[in-house]
Amino acid sequence: MSHLALKDLFSGFFVIDDEEEVEVPDKQQQVNEAPAKEQSQQTTKQNAIKSVPQKSASRYTTTSEERNNRMSNYSKNNSRNVVTMNNATPNNASQESSKMCLFEPRVFSDTQDIADELKNRRATLVNLQRIDKVSAKRIIDFLSGTVYAIGGDIQRVGTDIFLCTPDNVEVAGSITDHIENMEHSFD
């Protein structure tokens, strides 16, 4: 805002009209002139507002153009830093899928360690033979939810022994049928 525009704005507020200085002895005349005074004050304010210069629209268009140029330059500069996931995952996936963790939890709180290994895409074999049945059921419920969340699978491979696998591990076949046959052959 320029200096002159500010001066015009403030001078419009402090202008004294000749009509305002005249004293009116009659109350009837004061009542009639009160709306006239308000109207003259409103026109003074409107004139002061009109004297304020409007912001130009060209200022905003240059800003958006500059921003678009900066964003396009930014994306061009950073395009060489992008690495495709297909190139990065084969080595990592083969290393992660080759490791299997064995667990024999004694208390329910040990289940968190099993879930962490599953989240890190490692297969786990869980032996629940040394824990009470109620805790074993809670552990299986928890691991079933974990495996479901990561898109994996849980299978019973023996008496109170479970295989939990993440989505990058595929289990072919079923061991349960073989174990049942082996148990019956020893009887």
Curated annotation (Swiss-Prot):
Region (Disordered) location: 21-97
UniProt xrefs under Pfam families: SepF (PF04472)
Keywords: Cell cycle, Cell division, Cytoplasm, Septation
Highest taxon, organism lineage: Bacteria
Main localization (coarse): cytoplasm
Gene3D superfamilies attached to this UniProt entry: SepF-like protein (3.30.110.150)
Keyword Secreted attributed: no
Compartment list: Cytoplasm
Family: Belongs to the SepF family.
Protein's name according to its UniProt entry: Cell division protein SepF
Gene that encodes the chain: sepF
